Amino acid sequence: MTNIRKTHPLIKIVNHSFIDLPTPSNISAWWNFGSLLGFCLIIQIVTGLFLAMHYTSDTMTAFSSVTHICRDVNYGWLIRYMHANGASMFFICLFLHVGRGLYYGSYTYLETWNIGVILLFAVMATAFMGYVLPWGQMSFWGATVITNLLSAIPYMGTTLVEWIWGGFSVDKATLTRFFAFHFVLPFIIAALAMIHLLFLHETGSNNPSGLISDSDKIPFHPYFSIKDLLGVLILLLIFMNLVLFTPDLLGDPDNYIPANPLNTPPHIKPEWYFLFAYAILRSIPNKLGGVVALVFSILILMLFPILHMSKQRSMMFRPLSQCFFWILVADLFTLTWIGGQPVEYPFITIGQVASILYFTIILIILPSISLLENKLLKW
């Protein structure tokens, strides 16, 4: 009798994806983030589902319904803070996952990489709409400022913004549709993640050396299933520490003030994971230019396969590229810091320098350094 694991139409798919999957034997902990992202997505969908049972998407009652969840629902405070901080953990894992892909040259798997970038956009859209739902001050003004950016699109901008708002300002119609999209997008993200995995399994995983590893592969289970489980436990430890001890560490105090269209907060800023892009947006004095730079700051990831000039796939044996990769990481930290600062000297100048450096490293320095390293190989 043959093993049901290998013959059953459904179980066979699971088997080829998570059990008998041939995996390079030398993949490091940097390869844990895919499974951690899956885990984060499950946490977000489950907690989100329970929050949706008690939340009302009406401007009059949205803020009160969140208060009700925290005060009156059994473990509502836990569900709410797990959902809010789960988004932060999601983005931490996402940034590390993308960074790993850039460092080790995983972007040469074109389909996997491009679907990954689409996934990043989808998660960012979901997080933005989720931030609007509690209907606090930062929710309202964040939604107003970010959606208003679309008015920079020539000819059709204003019409487009009013169409998204469902009126002449962010109001009940906007909140209702944002709730609807915020509810449905995670399921689309889950479907995209499956496609992402499907394309990855067509080629097999990359590994730290960037070399072909067909001659040295081991089954995913039990080796990497145990390794992933350790990653999940470490993530849970950090996550629950955040949720149970400092749940408001990454949030904005202004969001505990109910939305008031007549009172603008002194500093309007998005959640921390959007600050780098927000800093790039603000560093350009022109509105349309800022919006283009904002979109391109993420879309630039799709150019990496084209900009790859090196004869080696990974940066493991390329010290000069490594140096500039870490300068790029430091630059992203700088942009994140600047995005949370008021628009005044010296922050404006620092933001502009950091924005120029971001695009220069990616578009000019890294490809040039790669060509230099190719020359040094022959030397």
Curated annotation (Swiss-Prot):
UniProt-annotated binding residues for a ubiquinone: H201
Binding locations of heme b b562: H83, H182
Cofactor binding note: Binds 2 heme b groups non-covalently.
Principal place of residence: mitochondrion
Topology class, membrane: Multi-pass membrane protein
Residues involved in heme b b566 binding: H97, H196
Keywords on record: Electron transport, Heme, Iron, Membrane, Metal-binding, Mitochondrion, Mitochondrion inner membrane, Respiratory chain, Transmembrane, Transmembrane helix, Transport, Ubiquinone
Entry superkingdom: Eukaryota
Residues that span the membrane, as ranges: 33-53, 77-98, 113-133, 178-198, 226-246, 288-308, 320-340, 347-367
Required co-factors: heme b
A GO BP annotation: mitochondrial electron transport, ubiquinol to cytochrome c
SUPFAM superfamilies in UniProt: a domain/subunit of cytochrome bc1 complex (Ubiquinol-cytochrome c reductase), Transmembrane di-heme cytochromes
Pfam short name (any one): Cytochrome_B
A cellular-component GO term for this protein: mitochondrial inner membrane
Subunit field text: The cytochrome bc1 complex contains 11 subunits: 3 respiratory subunits (MT-CYB, CYC1 and UQCRFS1), 2 core proteins (UQCRC1 and UQCRC2) and 6 low-molecular weight proteins (UQCRH/QCR6, UQCRB/QCR7, UQCRQ/QCR8, UQCR10/QCR9, UQCR11/QCR10 and a cleavage product of UQCRFS1). This cytochrome bc1 complex then forms a dimer.
Biological function: Component of the ubiquinol-cytochrome c reductase complex (complex III or cytochrome b-c1 complex) that is part of the mitochondrial respiratory chain. The b-c1 complex mediates electron transfer from ubiquinol to cytochrome c. Contributes to the generation of a proton gradient across the mitochondrial membrane that is then used for ATP synthesis.
Additional remarks: Heme 1 (or BL or b562) is low-potential and absorbs at about 562 nm, and heme 2 (or BH or b566) is high-potential and absorbs at about 566 nm.
Family affiliation: Belongs to the cytochrome b family.
Name used for this protein in its record: Cytochrome b
Gene behind this protein: MT-CYB
